Amino acid sequence: GKGVFVIMLDICLLGTGGMMPLPYRWLTSMMARYNGQSILIDCGEGTQIAMKEKGWSPKPIDVICFTHFHADHISGLPGMLLTMGNAERTQPLLLVGPKGLSRVVSALRVIAPELPFEINCMELTESEQTISMNGFRIEAFKVNHNVPCYGYCIVVDRIGKFQVDRALELAIDKRYWSILQRGESVSTEKGNFTPEMVLGEPRKGLRVVYCTDTRPTESIVQHAGNADLFICEGMYGEPEKQAKARENKH
């Protein structure tokens, strides 16, 4: 029968609490794993403990994205950086967040001044920005909180189906088929071949949207409307708390 194509994207909600931790709920943090890489979105107090409880590791984290700079979303960062350093991490770490990220990180690093790896800060200045990773991308989009705040969308694209008849017509040696199928070009004695020559139309991939601390916005509708998984806050879920939600921009 036909093979089934599966995109393995693991999502773990490490913390879902707001303002203060509870015995059963740490402060805000979400981790995603794909293709040997990990993304952390927010790093509230208790993130490391939750990671240990779930059996996840901070070692493969390539990027940490911050929605905004309230303490319950970022106060776990210094300890996380120190743990990475103690684990002898040497590869650079990318931090992504609203304007002012470098200043906030510098202040938090007063208690984590010496690290064996480089930290690169990417400050978001547009209403929408894309960060390209290895095999997937992160889309940041502005939302509406009482400080600059962004939602994030993790997108795993799926390339088109390999067209055997096209490959045969072009007389491409079969040993190169798997390379082209991965989306990589090849240079052979018969010439150069690109994936576009042998792949069909792109197929539906996977889209995960994470959004917290915001009023309802059109940007959320645009990015989450066709999401496979939409993770959203519910800080003031009860009807009697609607006025409080509007006041605090939740």
Sequence positions of predicted segments:
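Short, Lys/Arg-enriched N-terminal segments with co-localized hydrophobic residues
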Residues: 1-7
